[in-house]
């Protein structure tokens, strides 16, 4: 039986899983003829949900959505173990259901995300079409934002999920000309997403922190902080290059990497607020892809 802290509502379990359990039992019996499966042909209540065999749990989990699977992973160690394998058919089926085909078929876009479970997580952290300037739109792949050619306008977009704990990494790729302003960085939920003229909107107030890839300037509170990377004559960003942004909420800092090259600390003393990945652009028809790759490899 479950402990008090981990106890899963048995009534909910039986209600949610009863329709699927018959199918699961038949599939399990086709795979294995052990006597231990015969109890499922009678009544669900004869077996604790925490002791169901892996093959039965996988067959049942196949019918659940992402939110329910996340809850199941917190029920007990047995269920967590079943769902930990990142390329099981449960995650594969859900990924093919949730993530657009345009993204799954673009091997370059998700090349750093090998497993289906991590692809699902990346999609959950992608650009938010409902938290964007009206002059942007999200491409069908769900990971790439396109800025429409609107004159005298600076347009921004935030990611779906903000962070205020742990260490997180996103990868940005800028396709198309940069124009005079092309910033990537962080923003609170209060940061502006649109303004008139061509300005570095990301970093224009105390609610955002930006790196302008055009002139290699760090920006915050409407002030240029310093050139970045912190070297003489830093190289210009080349269209299509992948830039990784790492946010360390424990150290309240942010830094960037290009390939295996550490570019140095960009911002320190970040506030303990929920911060969202963001970008701002001014050039018409430019596109920016953002992929969440989880905690970075440290070493």
UniProtKB/Swiss-Prot annotation:
Key words, A-Z: Synapse, Ubl conjugation pathway
PANTHER family reported for this sequence: F-BOX_SPRY DOMAIN-CONTAINING PROTEIN 1, SPRY DOMAIN CONTAINING SOCS BOX PROTEIN
InterPro entries xref list: B30.2/SPRY, B30.2/SPRY_sf, ConA-like_dom_sf, F-box-like_dom_sf, F-box_dom, FBXO45-Fsn/SPSB_families, SPRY_dom, SPRY_FBXO45
A GO term for molecular function: protease binding
Entry's family note: Belongs to the FBXO45/Fsn family.
GO biological process, one term: response to ionizing radiation
Domain spans labelled F-box: 46-94
SMART domains per UniProt: FBOX, SPRY
Zinc-finger in keyword set: no
Organism per entry: Brugia malayi (Filarial nematode worm)
Species lineage: Eukaryota, Metazoa, Ecdysozoa, Nematoda, Chromadorea
This protein's record includes keyword Lipoprotein: no
Function, as annotated: Component of a SCF (SKP1-CUL1-F-box protein) E3 ubiquitin ligase complex which may regulate restriction and/or maturation of synapses.
UniProt-recorded name of the protein: F-box/SPRY domain-containing protein 1
Record text on subunit structure and interactions: Component of a SCF (SKP1-CUL1-F-box protein) E3 ubiquitin ligase complex.
Pathway membership: Protein modification; protein ubiquitination
Highest rank taxon of the organism: Eukaryota
Cellular compartments annotated: Synapse
Domain B30.2/SPRY residues, every copy: 105-297
Annotated GO CC locations: neuromuscular junction; neuron projection; presynapse; SCF ubiquitin ligase complex
